[in-house]
Amino acid sequence: MTTQKIVPTKSTDGSKLFRHQAKFVAGAMNINQIPNFSLPEIAFVGKSNVGKSSLINTICNNKNLAKVSNTAGRTRQINFFNLADKLIIVDLPGYGFANVPISVKEQWGVLISYYLRNSYNLRLVNLLIDSRRGIKENDKKVADLLLANKREFQIIFTKSDKVTDHKNLHDEAQNFLATLNYSCNVMYVSNRSKEGARELKASLAKCIKFQK
């Protein structure tokens, strides 16, 4: 089992795509509110407070694009951002711990699951993992859901500046992917140092075959 390494090229350099300005276009708090865009969609999913919104702001070069909070569970809807009519970036609510009633957690679970199962234009899912915590049971369940629905995904270890050795994370990811019999990109990103941002942009541009 090996992971693919993203090497930005002239045709897939994400900086060309992400030099455009992204804007918020829709929010969905239930499945009936999920819009149907005619553009490719790329989603970001992970546990509460893993850094989804911050990462979206980093790659879009706009710290105010997606609302960021230090309190887990504050993203309570699916947020959709349009990047220059080339791509829809999807910020999903965090799963796992959230200081909200069980009924609300269940509602989020239904919303996330429905979107991942049914989005016609979904091209890639970025499964975000906190580098300090490693891969947890909820992350494994999401990966199983993605594979069951033939969704392509890549693993993004966030807050990479908080750990000094990536080898253990790499080994953990390799072992995890081996159990799934799946191969994908594994990246390390930091919103503070911007580590991995260029490679992530390149992978997204490559996914939608952006070349101009």
Swiss-Prot record:
Keywords assigned: Cell cycle, Cell division, GTP-binding, Magnesium, Metal-binding, Nucleotide-binding, Septation
One function term, GO molecular function aspect: metal ion binding
Any one Pfam family match given in the protein's UniProt record, by short name: MMR_HSR1
Domain spans labelled EngB-type G: 38-210
Alphabetized InterPro entries for the sequence: G_ENGB_dom, GTP-bd, GTP-bd_ribosome_bio_YsxC, P-loop_NTPase
Binding site for GTP: 46-53, 73-77, 91-94, 158-161, 189-191
Binding site for Mg(2+): S53, T75
Superkingdom of this protein's organism: Bacteria
Cofactor requirement: Mg(2+)
Job of this protein: Necessary for normal cell division and for the maintenance of normal septation.
Family, per entry: Belongs to the TRAFAC class TrmE-Era-EngA-EngB-Septin-like GTPase superfamily. EngB GTPase family.
Protein name according to UniProt: Probable GTP-binding protein EngB
Organism: Rickettsia rickettsii (strain Sheila Smith)
